[in-house]
Design a protein with these regions (language model features):
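N-terminal intrinsically disordered, cationic/polar leader segments
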Residues: 1-90
Length: 90
């Protein structure tokens, strides 16, 4: 079976990303508005300044899921990835 890896785009400026078990949970003003299984994701792109829980960052780093933060207008702020595997000196 072929594994399709998807990217989660969070475009709401007031959204906060958290971890519940093996799920990414999107909160907006302390209300849950979405839930996605972590094993289906290759990357998460967040537009806005609210942030992500440290538990979700750690889980994404362990599973090699990239987190990318952009301003509400789309300007790049930061990218977080997991450990590099293999020979990095090449």
């Amino acid at each position: 079976m072929r594994k399709l890896l998807n990217t989660l785009y969070v475009t709401s400026e007031n959204s906060y990303l958290g971890l519940d078990g093996e799920n990414v949970v999107v909160y907006d003003d302390k209300k849950e508005i979405g839930r996605v299984p972590l094993h289906n994701l290759e990357g998460i792109v967040s537009f806005g300044y609210r942030g992500t829980s440290s538990a979700l960052m750690g889980a994404c780093a362990d599973k090699n899921i990239s987190l990318c933060y952009l301003t509400p207008q789309g300007k790049f702020l930061a990218r977080i990835t997991g450990k590099i595997k293999g020979n990095v000196i090449l």
